[in-house]
C-alpha cells in the first residue's frame, strides 16, 4: 500500500489530477518485491467476479460517495464468505485457440450452492443447450 498505491495516487494529486474512481494495479511479485506491470482505471477482470458478489453495500452508493468525495462517510460491508475465481482457457490460448469445442461440467457447477458461473468466450451451440468455446478465455 505504502510502496505503490499511495505514491501513485499522491503523485497524481500533486500533478493536478486527483484520482476518483476504480484504479486497478496489475502487480507481479518478484524477488525484489512487487512491481507494477499495468494500471487500469476499471475493475480487474477476472478478479471482480470473485470480489463483487461478496459486497453487501450497494455499489452505486459507493461510486456516488467517491464522486461526491464522501467515501469516508459511508460504511462498506462485505459478507464473510470466501471467494475464488477459476478461469478456463481454450487450448492454444493466448495464441491460436480452438473454437466450437463442447465445455462440460457447467450445469453441474451452476447447480452447486454458492457457486456463480460467468461466461466469456463461450456460446450456446445452435439448437441446443450445449455450451462451446467461442473465444480464448
List PLM regions with ranges.
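Short acidic-glycine loop/turn motifs at beta-strand connectors
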Residues: 29-33, 126
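A short pocket-lining beta-strand/turn micro-motif at the edge of beta-sheets
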Residues: 113-116, 135-137
Amino acid at each position: 500500500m505504502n510502496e505503490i498505491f499511495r505514491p501513485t495516487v499522491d503523485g497524481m494529486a500533486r500533478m493536478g489530477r486527483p484520482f476518483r474512481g476504480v484504479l486497478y494495479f496489475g502487480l507481479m511479485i518478484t524477488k525484489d518485491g512487487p512491481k507494477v506491470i499495468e494500471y487500469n482505471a476499471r475493475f480487474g477482470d477476472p478478479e471482480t467476479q470473485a470480489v463483487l458478489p461478496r459486497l453487501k453495500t450497494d455499489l452505486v452508493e459507493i461510486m456516488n460517495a467517491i464522486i461526491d468525495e464522501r467515501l469516508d462517510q459511508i460504511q462498506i460491508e462485505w459478507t464473510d464468505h470466501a471467494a475464488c475465481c477459476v478461469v478456463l482457457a481454450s487450448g492454444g490460448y493466448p495464441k491460436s485457440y480452438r473454437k466450437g469445442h463442447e465445455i462440460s461440467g457447467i450445469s453441474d457447477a451452476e447447480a452447486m450452492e454458492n457457486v456463480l458461473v460467468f461466461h466469456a468466450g463461450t456460446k450456446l451451440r445452435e439448437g441446443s443447450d450445449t455450451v462451446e468455446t467461442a473465444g480464448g478465455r
